């Protein structure tokens, strides 16, 4: 078998397109619209309570979470020979660079990959061939990069230490450039939301958090669609309740997961929650009854009797 370096093969830039954009989302510094093409080198930035979904050439969907900055570094189809009638096919190679924030990726399961789909942060490199996972790089001072695997198998490498580990479904790892070992950790289980109320009323809108062993905080995400393509709230909750009172009065999908002491976020549970308008104020009290009329004046005294 002759192995040819990938750089010597002919390729065509693949088509990446915007599937969803909610809130303040920019592509290359300009507002990003659904249906827009994302070229290689295209940088996607989301603001607070904003998100976007980009579909790569192989069908992989990359969800750019709120307050994130990501770049489509490569999105390519390489020409390959095969035993088909035409004698050729295309193999995909893709690389996403996360400078800040969180990406949720659902990679297409396909054998036609020239390289594993890769997500790169300043301190880590994650490679997959078909899976669902999250990559986060939120604190440039600590330089921690998180990887959490929801489905499939991921390879997470510490690029500074030339070390790494395979992460199967339901596990995660925190990678720091100063620590050589990549420790594989079991993610927290999905919380049970069945006992939580299905509605809250404005203006308070307080929604309780479920009990979950090992959780020191929670991640709560709110979207109008069950696929969470349009996330309108992304909240880290350290208390016992989350405030949903600023949401519009309609039905929402709430996604909740626990966060462990290392900062790894666990598996999700989803529940529909209705935000209700505040109850009408009570009617004003009736006016007080009018005061009683004053008593009539006493009759005048009788005239004196003269004899």
Identify what each model region corresponds to.
Residues 1-43, 56-203, 304-306:
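Flexible, surface-exposed loop/linker segments and immediately adjacent secondary-structure boundaries
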Residues 19-22, 212-217:
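Short proline/glycine-enriched turn/loop motifs at strand-loop junctions of beta-rich domains
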Residues 28, 221-225, 259:
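Predominantly extracellular/luminal cell-surface or secreted proteins
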Residues 203-214:
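Conserved aromatic anchor
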Residues 231-238:
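Short beta-strand segments within Ig-like beta-sandwich modules, predominantly Fibronectin type-III
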Residues 244-252:
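Surface-exposed, short loops/turns at beta-strand junctions within beta-sandwich domains
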Residues 261-278:
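Extracellular fibronectin type III
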